[in-house]
Amino acid sequence: MNLHEYQSKHLLKKYNIPVPASEVVFNPDAAVDAAAKIGGDRWVVKAQVHAGGRGKAGGVRLVKNKEELKSAVKALLGTRLVTYQTDERGQPVNQILVEQTSDIARELYLGAVIDRASQRIVFMASTEGGVEIEKVAEKSPEKILKVTVDPAIGLQPFQCRQLFFGLGLQDLKQMRSFTDIVMGLYRLFTERDLSLLEINPLVITGSGELICLDAKINIDDSALYRQSELREMRDTTQEDEHETMAQQWELNYIKLDGNIGCMVNGAGLAMATMDLIKLSGGDPANFLDVGGSATKERVTEAFKIIASDKNVKGILVNIFGGIVRCDLIADGIISAVKEVGIDVPVVVRLEGNNAQLGAKKLADSGMNIIAAKGFADAAEQIVKQVGVIA
């Protein structure tokens, strides 16, 4: 789960991590009130979306008076911001962060992530702040400093100092501030079950202060059950509606750009199914794993999600009956085709537990459901059917 910048900074403040004074607003008049509360004569207007690259897309603007402020907020609210991290439709702008300006002398990068290779938290820092860290990693990986946290003892102050001096910084007052910030970020990361935390940029002001100018936080979805405060921060308007619907039924769904819908039980089999569709000349429209405990209801909902994608021209169901019974899957398929009114070709491959009974139910249903003879045949059949439609 992702947080907006204003939500991330709200958490940072709880851990005594310095951020600029700011207010989130939902209409232009509130922006003027927010500016008066913040003070000063210049402000930064930031569109709140779950995507990077806002500045280049016009989603971050410097305003020099309250008339410009009101105009900028009015121009952004209710629009969809398209950045290099969004699709062509962009993300809806429903909130604006009005923030005080900062006297920036230097921009740095600071982040933390769970490294799957070492199975530990890794803190990263770079002198290349204010730019996409992915580009730095690609072009100049030597500019990214890393320290790995031993989970038995946690992050240590000497590791913070190691990053500080590695960034070419020397001032002792800044060293203490930097150490406090990194230690605070570590507490935030571990106590709130984060999977990603980025401060980009961490700025040094003209007066030598360190301030977190932007913040990005991702939370481990598997830990949300114990993070009630963070659960309330979820903004489903920033998420794909199909993926949101799938989560409600505990379905693992990821939308893709193809036209062949896939419904499979098991993540490995689902990926193999997509590979075989590609090898057969087709393009998968999604990854959808109904899981090992698939029920008739979940299969029906899975069909609804796939069918709601207007790009889908055919559906391939690939089920291996280990834990799940193929006859129950067949019941779900029949129910879904009737209820949803599927008007595209459906190819089904059933193998394993009660596969013959499931195939018989499909054959006796009287519906236009194509039974495949095997894995490869299923992929070839659906690609052929979709090709006929195209």
From Swiss-Prot:
<dbReference type="InterPro" id="IPR013650">
    <property type="entry name" value="ATP-grasp_succ-CoA_synth-type"/>
</dbReference>
<feature type="binding site">
    <location>
        <position position="265"/>
    </location>
    <ligand>
        <name>substrate</name>
    </ligand>
</feature>
<keyword id="KW-0816">Tricarboxylic acid cycle</keyword>
<dbReference type="InterPro" id="IPR005809">
    <property type="entry name" value="Succ_CoA_ligase-like_bsu"/>
</dbReference>
<comment type="pathway">
    <text>Carbohydrate metabolism; tricarboxylic acid cycle; succinate from succinyl-CoA (ligase route): step 1/1.</text>
</comment>
<dbReference type="Pfam" id="PF00549">
    <property type="entry name" value="Ligase_CoA"/>
</dbReference>
<comment type="subunit">
    <text>Heterotetramer of two alpha and two beta subunits.</text>
</comment>
<feature type="binding site">
    <location>
        <position position="107"/>
    </location>
    <ligand>
        <name>ATP</name>
    </ligand>
</feature>
<feature type="binding site">
    <location>
        <position position="46"/>
    </location>
    <ligand>
        <name>ATP</name>
    </ligand>
</feature>
<comment type="function">
    <text>Succinyl-CoA synthetase functions in the citric acid cycle (TCA), coupling the hydrolysis of succinyl-CoA to the synthesis of either ATP or GTP and thus represents the only step of substrate-level phosphorylation in the TCA. The beta subunit provides nucleotide specificity of the enzyme and binds the substrate succinate, while the binding sites for coenzyme A and phosphate are found in the alpha subunit.</text>
</comment>
<dbReference type="GO" id="GO:0004776">
    <property type="term" value="F:succinate-CoA ligase (GDP-forming) activity"/>
</dbReference>
<dbReference type="InterPro" id="IPR016102">
    <property type="entry name" value="Succinyl-CoA_synth-like"/>
</dbReference>
<feature type="binding site">
    <location>
        <position position="102"/>
    </location>
    <ligand>
        <name>ATP</name>
    </ligand>
</feature>
<feature type="binding site">
    <location>
        <position position="200"/>
    </location>
    <ligand>
        <name>Mg(2+)</name>
    </ligand>
</feature>
<feature type="binding site">
    <location>
        <position position="99"/>
    </location>
    <ligand>
        <name>ATP</name>
    </ligand>
</feature>
<dbReference type="GO" id="GO:0006099">
    <property type="term" value="P:tricarboxylic acid cycle"/>
</dbReference>
<dbReference type="InterPro" id="IPR011761">
    <property type="entry name" value="ATP-grasp"/>
</dbReference>
<feature type="domain" description="ATP-grasp">
    <location>
        <begin position="9"/>
        <end position="245"/>
    </location>
</feature>
<keyword id="KW-0436">Ligase</keyword>
<dbReference type="GO" id="GO:0000287">
    <property type="term" value="F:magnesium ion binding"/>
</dbReference>
<dbReference type="GO" id="GO:0042709">
    <property type="term" value="C:succinate-CoA ligase complex"/>
</dbReference>
<dbReference type="GO" id="GO:0006104">
    <property type="term" value="P:succinyl-CoA metabolic process"/>
</dbReference>
<dbReference type="GO" id="GO:0005524">
    <property type="term" value="F:ATP binding"/>
</dbReference>
<keyword id="KW-0479">Metal-binding</keyword>
<dbReference type="Pfam" id="PF08442">
    <property type="entry name" value="ATP-grasp_2"/>
</dbReference>
<comment type="similarity">
    <text>Belongs to the succinate/malate CoA ligase beta subunit family.</text>
</comment>
<feature type="binding site">
    <location>
        <position position="214"/>
    </location>
    <ligand>
        <name>Mg(2+)</name>
    </ligand>
</feature>
<feature type="binding site">
    <location>
        <begin position="322"/>
        <end position="324"/>
    </location>
    <ligand>
        <name>substrate</name>
    </ligand>
</feature>
<keyword id="KW-0547">Nucleotide-binding</keyword>
<protein>
    <recommendedName>
        <fullName>Succinate--CoA ligase [ADP-forming] subunit beta</fullName>
        <ecNumber>6.2.1.5</ecNumber>
    </recommendedName>
</protein>
<dbReference type="GO" id="GO:0004775">
    <property type="term" value="F:succinate-CoA ligase (ADP-forming) activity"/>
</dbReference>
<keyword id="KW-0460">Magnesium</keyword>
<dbReference type="GO" id="GO:0005829">
    <property type="term" value="C:cytosol"/>
</dbReference>
<dbReference type="InterPro" id="IPR013815">
    <property type="entry name" value="ATP_grasp_subdomain_1"/>
</dbReference>
<feature type="binding site">
    <location>
        <begin position="53"/>
        <end position="55"/>
    </location>
    <ligand>
        <name>ATP</name>
    </ligand>
</feature>
<dbReference type="InterPro" id="IPR017866">
    <property type="entry name" value="Succ-CoA_synthase_bsu_CS"/>
</dbReference>
<dbReference type="InterPro" id="IPR005811">
    <property type="entry name" value="SUCC_ACL_C"/>
</dbReference>
<keyword id="KW-0067">ATP-binding</keyword>
